[in-house]
Amino acid sequence: MAMRQCAIYGKGGIGKSTTTQNLVAALAEMGKKVMIVGCDPKADSTRLILHSKAQNTIMEMAAEAGTVEDLELEDVLKVGYGGVKCVESGGPEPGVGCAGRGVITAINFLEEEGAYEDDLDFVFYDVLGDVVCGGFAMPIRENKAQEIYIVCSGEMMAMYAANNISKGIVKYANSGSVRLGGLICNSRNTDREDELIIALAAKLGTQMIHFVPRDNVVQRAEIRRMTVIEYDPTAKQADEYRTLARKVVENKMLIIPNPITMDELEALLMEFGVMEEEDESIVGKAAAAEE
């Protein structure tokens, strides 16, 4: 099969890296050849696959070596569980420079060094938070990733971020081949969460590709720096990630999304009881004034 390049976006803290690594572990278990490119200065996109605290990043090693041209592919590419290839782009120290530049530098380096030529089935880009700047949009802006999956939950800000990311996809979809493959609901156990994300997906013109339930085995595995697939392959949660992997492999629904307005998003949240009807009479009133 031709190599598929997928980017995983979503609100910060939503569980993108955990979801991506468990999905990738399930793909590796299926016999797929996969590479993860971490596009986040935290460099935590590969820790569960490599059983390490944080992988040395391309930007760190380039700074030590002098320039990125002084690096070799084997310096930055590590192989972990199931033969998964792992690379972290990294970024500058907090408050210094543009982390998005790290993503651009890393992907260009990997291309020049032939990292993509090794009969890979999938490349996954695990991308920082929202599409916050042009650098982080690089995997979709430069037509590197053709498929985008957005990790979200039934919480308002996660849905707001999913809608914002959809706007970013539209911006680049019209001039390139990038498409939205679906929403992955990483459950926070909010009320009617699966129905809400199915409804949001329908409004965006996409699908909820899978609902990943909340399970404490994920945290138990993470403490050991392992995916659930490796830590407890018999766990029900491991089967959830296997189902997600199978759905991604079989996914043919790749669309240009139809982002909604803030008013439409709020109306959806009110419909499902996540947000109360707006009452102008209470706006700006402190608790003491309401007594």
From Swiss-Prot:
The UniProt keywords, alphabetically, are: 4Fe-4S, ADP-ribosylation, ATP-binding, Iron, Iron-sulfur, Metal-binding, Nitrogen fixation, Nucleotide-binding, Oxidoreductase
Q: Which chemical reaction does it catalyze?
A: N2 + 8 reduced [2Fe-2S]-[ferredoxin] + 16 ATP + 16 H2O = H2 + 8 oxidized [2Fe-2S]-[ferredoxin] + 2 NH4(+) + 16 ADP + 16 phosphate + 6 H(+)
**Entry's EC annotation:** 1.18.6.1
Q: Which GO terms describe its molecular function?
A: 4 iron, 4 sulfur cluster binding; ATP binding; metal ion binding; nitrogenase activity
Q: Which residues form the signal peptide?
A: none
Binding positions for ATP per the UniProt entry: G10, K11, G12, G13, I14, G15, K16, S17
* ADP-ribosylarginine sites (modified residues): R101
Positions with a binding annotation for [4Fe-4S] cluster? C98, C133
Instruction: Report what the Swiss-Prot or TrEMBL entry states about this protein's PTMs.
Output: The reversible ADP-ribosylation of Arg-101 inactivates the nitrogenase reductase and regulates nitrogenase activity.
InterPro entries registered for this protein in UniProt: NifH/chlL_CS (IPR030655), NifH/frxC (IPR000392), Nitrogenase_Fe_NifH (IPR005977), P-loop_NTPase (IPR027417)
On whether Transmembrane is a keyword of this UniProt record, the answer is no
> Which cofactor is recorded for it?
[4Fe-4S] cluster
Q: Which domain of life is it from?
A: Bacteria
Q: Name one GO biological process term.
A: nitrogen fixation
Query: What does the note under cofactor report?
Result: Binds 1 [4Fe-4S] cluster per dimer.
Q: Which family does it belong to?
A: Belongs to the NifH/BchL/ChlL family.
- Describe the subunit structure: Homodimer.
Q: What does this protein do?
A: The key enzymatic reactions in nitrogen fixation are catalyzed by the nitrogenase complex, which has 2 components: the iron protein (component 2) and a component 1 which is either a molybdenum-iron protein, a vanadium-iron, or an iron-iron protein.
> Other notes on this protein?
This subunit is associated with the molybdenum-iron nitrogenase component 2.
What name does UniProt use for this protein? Nitrogenase iron protein 1
Tell me the name of the encoding gene: nifH1
